[in-house]
Amino acid sequence: MKVLSIVGARPQFVKLAPIAHALVPGGHEHVIVHTGQHYDANMSDVFFEDLDIPAPNVHLGVGSGSHGVQTGAMLSAMDGVLDEHRPDWVLVYGDTNSTIAGALSAVKLHFPLAHLEAGLRSFNRRMPEEHNRVLTDHAADLCLAPTQTAMDHLVREGLGERAVLVGDVMTDVCLSVAAQVRDSAPLLPEGVDGSADYLVSTIHRAENTDDPEQLRSIIDALAALPIPVVLLAHPRLVSRAATAGIDLKRGALRPTAPLGYPQMVAAVLHSRGVVTDSGGLQKEAFLLGAPCTTLRTETEWTETVDLGWNVLRPRVDDLAAVVMRPRPTPSTASPYGDGRAAEATVATLMKHLR
């Protein structure tokens, strides 16, 4: 079986790792296409090294740009790649511009398309990611769902016959890496004591960074928190803050460049909790036993809220009280699978091979 994976953003590299490893025992051919959507070394190269992912076979190098420019550049470059490699499956991951570009290229050239992490829904149509994931699901020949909730969404949209519940591949990676780094001291910026309370934060979504006043209110609230905040500063955040004249190095804030995946897992494992607008980090916080406060009105990972480990808080006026809340009762629930989703994914691709 020949699988062509299309990735381009940090969360996709994490999802790619267990798939790349799971394809090896069966002797399957795996072509990795990196679109270049995340072009910063801290957002790309380090993940391939840390997670032992083979180097990409193809690098499109599209770089930054508006949604239209970026997606169009990927589409323009992808046709030749698919025609050259002619895979049995085109596998796309998550909900980025790389996802929708890969999906459109595959279906227009009549290559079988599988969508990993299918069925997630925020029901917020202002999110570009929501359009990417919905359109990709409806284009896909095979929808690989991470949770029962995602399966339910697919069934309601009439996609049940081509949907399979495989579990969440990020859980495979997160649990494996956590076991490796649990006893390691986290790599933290100067001024943060890993043995004392601290928070981990990421802010990168357009709704929180494009409006200078919204961004300023979030940064002010984080800076006013009573314990240090390790701010993993996404390039988008750094750029928007600089343009708006917002100082990220003040009060409780301890900004640092994005960490490699093992370092990020260690930082969250030892933290008091997480404050984020990221989708993946909400779930990782749950898996690592860190209470999460999500600066959004909705989440795709509703299980984290239902089980008491995640609080949605789009307003930041009472942020301190929320993030310092008591730790919830530990949960034995495993809504994201048993850590073997990649194996289930490969088996499902084989079963549905044309």
Describe each PLM feature range.
Residues 38-42, 61, 139-211, 332:
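A nucleotide-sugar donor-handling region in carbohydrate enzymes
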Residues 81-88, 193-194, 270, 352:
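Glycine-rich phosphate-binding loop signature in dinucleotide/nucleotide-binding domains
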Residues 4-7, 13-24, 47, 59-158:
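Active-site and donor-binding regions of nucleotide-sugar-utilizing enzymes
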Residues 92-93, 143, 264-304:
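A donor-sugar binding/catalytic signature common to diverse glycosyltransferases
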Residues 286-330:
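Nucleotide-sugar donor-binding patch of glycosyltransferase catalytic domains
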Residues 60, 145, 255-257, 310-315:
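Short acidic-hydrophobic, aromatic-tinged amphipathic segments that line or gate anion-handling sites
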Residues 48, 149, 311-354:
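Leloir-type glycosyltransferase catalytic cores
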Residues 37-40, 45, 65, 182-270:
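Donor-nucleotide binding loops and adjacent catalytic segments primarily
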